[in-house]
């Protein structure tokens, strides 16, 4: 069977879209959005990171991340502190850590539902294939 690449690409995008919609909808129950929770997750993984690093980690432009981070500061979820030179470091506040932790619970539930139709071996194979096309080693840990 020959697989059309555009159909394959669309199938990957459709699965991602379904997952993102479910996450965004359920994260609302803890007062967050997927974009906000993803930013908190990136800051939690790399406390003190710059906006440039966090923008790359969350697949956003620096400008978009800066706007989002500003909203997170106003909400009391993130603290910005001067770093080396002109660098601004980002840290979670205790409330930001609480929302991040609650979001992990939501994400585990949503992702369990999204992947429930796959056996563990199929999940491992899917992860390996996605990492292969991403150019990452299969055994590399990451988000």
Go through each PLM region and give its residues:
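N-terminal leader segment of winged-helix/HTH proteins
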Residues: 1-30, 77, 92, 98, ...
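C-terminal regulatory/oligomerization modules of transcriptional regulators
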Residues: 1-2, 120-143
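Short alpha-helical elements of helix-turn-helix
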Residues: 6-10, 30-41, 124
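Short helix-coil-helix linker/hinge
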Residues: 30-36, 64, 93, 116-120
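Charged, amphipathic alpha-helical coiled-coil/dimerization segments
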Residues: 48, 70-131
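Residues within helix-turn-helix
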Residues: 51-52, 63, 88
């Amino acid at each position: 069977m020959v697989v059309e690449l555009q159909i394959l690409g669309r199938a990957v995008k459709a699965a991602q879209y379904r997952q993102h919609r479910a996450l965004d909808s359920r994260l609302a129950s803890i007062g967050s959005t997927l974009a906000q929770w993803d930013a908190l997750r990136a800051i939690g993984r790399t406390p003190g990171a710059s906006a440039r690093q966090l923008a790359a980690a969350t697949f956003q432009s620096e400008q978009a991340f800066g706007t989002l981070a500003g909203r997170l500061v106003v909400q009391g979820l993130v603290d910005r502190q001067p770093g080396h030179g002109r660098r601004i470091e980002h840290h979670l506040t205790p409330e930001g850590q609480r929302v991040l932790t609650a979001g992990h619970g939501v994400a585990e539930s949503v992702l369990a539902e999204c992947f429930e139709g796959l056996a563990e071996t199929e999940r491992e194979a899917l992860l390996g294939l996605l990492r292969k096309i991403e150019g990452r080693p299969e055994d590399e840990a990451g988000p």
